[in-house]
Amino acid sequence: MKILVSACLLGRNCKYNGGNNHSAAVIDFLQGHEVIPVCPEVLAGLGTPRTPVEIVQGEVKTKDGKSVDKALRQAVAQILEENPDADCAVLKSRSPTCGVKQVYDGTFSGKLVDGMGVLAQALKDAGYRVIDVEDLP
């Protein structure tokens, strides 16, 4: 199987704070599969570390109000275009790009709401199986 994976889950330091979300469960799940690391924020040129972003009324913005929506959506489109034969995606929970079940509410207060990040939603809309990392066995 060819699996798209949030790069931070593989130990890449691409989180907004310069860290990662390395997950032994993800590494175990991926054994024997072709792995494609993805980080829309880095692909969009947002850098690491970077100002946090959240979805604010449908638009991805930085904490200081700058829209990065166009760049992120272009990065998402590129990921889909370059990986038409991926079988599924394992994505980081609560991320504004990768969140599968919940994302932060856009107030930068730490409050969660039901919803999907822009990459997760685009993958789902394109018919990919999208898995929240927290749902792995």
Regions found by a protein language model. Give the residues of each.
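Short amphipathic alpha-helices and their capping/turn segments at secondary-structure boundaries
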Residues: 22-36, 74-89
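General beta-strand structural signal in soluble alpha/beta enzymes
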Residues: 37-40, 89, 131-133
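Short beta-strand segments
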Residues: 6-7, 39, 90-94
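Extreme N-terminal starter segment of soluble prokaryotic enzymes
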Residues: 1-4
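Divalent-metal-activated hydrolytic enzyme cores
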Residues: 43, 52-55, 60-83, 111-137
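Short, surface-exposed acidic-centric catalytic microdomains
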Residues: 21-61
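N-terminal glycine-rich phosphate/adenylate-binding segment common to multiple enzyme folds
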Residues: 78-107
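Short N-terminal binding/cap micro-motifs at the start of the first secondary-structure element
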Residues: 11-18
